[in-house]
Amino acid sequence: MILFEDIFNRAVNLFDDPDIRRAYELNPVEFSQTMRPYLINGLGMFANPTTVSSRFSDYTEAQGKLEVFDGDGGATYTLSTVPVDNSVMSFFIGKTPDPLAEYDPTTQKVTFSTNVPVGTRCSCEWYYAGEFKADFTGFSSNISPSFIASRTKDILAHCLLLGWAENEKNFMLDIRGILTDTDFKLHSPANSVRAKTEWYQNIREGLNDLTQKLSWDLWSGAIGGRQIGK
């Protein structure tokens, strides 16, 4: 099993862009909602090794809920829904993000970092992006499933970015929307990503390197260990 969020967490570092990271940190729910279709669309770029890539057709659907409260002068409010395990959460006081707010699953309570004035709305949104039901058993006995899963997360992160690169213009409009909604602005459109051609080529080469390494690891493990499957 591989959580979509684990892939998002790796992918955000590959963007190497402060504005994207700020969107990721300030509004993780909307960021994950934006990322999800690029991950799904990028799956087709994971072609080899087929013994691994063929295991990603089964994944769960996304779930989420937005809850809005009328401020009563306090900082703590109770959710009426139970967030799905491994969900990300975004908190707002009015239209201002509150990344320091906390959720206590034992009490179902959200505590904002400051008291919410009477008449001001605050909100908590949780979002579970999904997970791949991939099973990495059945390979050589000296290659652990956790090793294959880790390699695969890096591959999928690169696939996500390549899927994004095909729609860069629309994606950056989405990112601008996230930042605008939270009273933050992009410093400069030129800062959005590195020179597009070079950046795209680096990600493409990175994907090729990762898939080749995984293929080699599986082959060398099968030769060097007791093979229990293909």
Predicted stretch roles:
Residues 172-178:
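Short, surface-exposed beta-strand/strand-loop-strand elements in extracellular ectodomains
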Residues 191-202:
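Glycine-rich, aromatic-bearing surface loops/beta-hairpins
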Residues 182-192:
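Eukaryote-specific, cytoplasm-facing alpha-helical/coiled-coil scaffolding segments in long proteins
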Residues 149-169:
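Elongated alpha-helical scaffolds
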Residues 1-67, 72, 76-78, 83-87, ...:
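Conserved short "hinge" loops at termini or chain/domain junctions
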Residues 45-48, 52, 162-170:
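Amphipathic alpha-helical interaction surfaces
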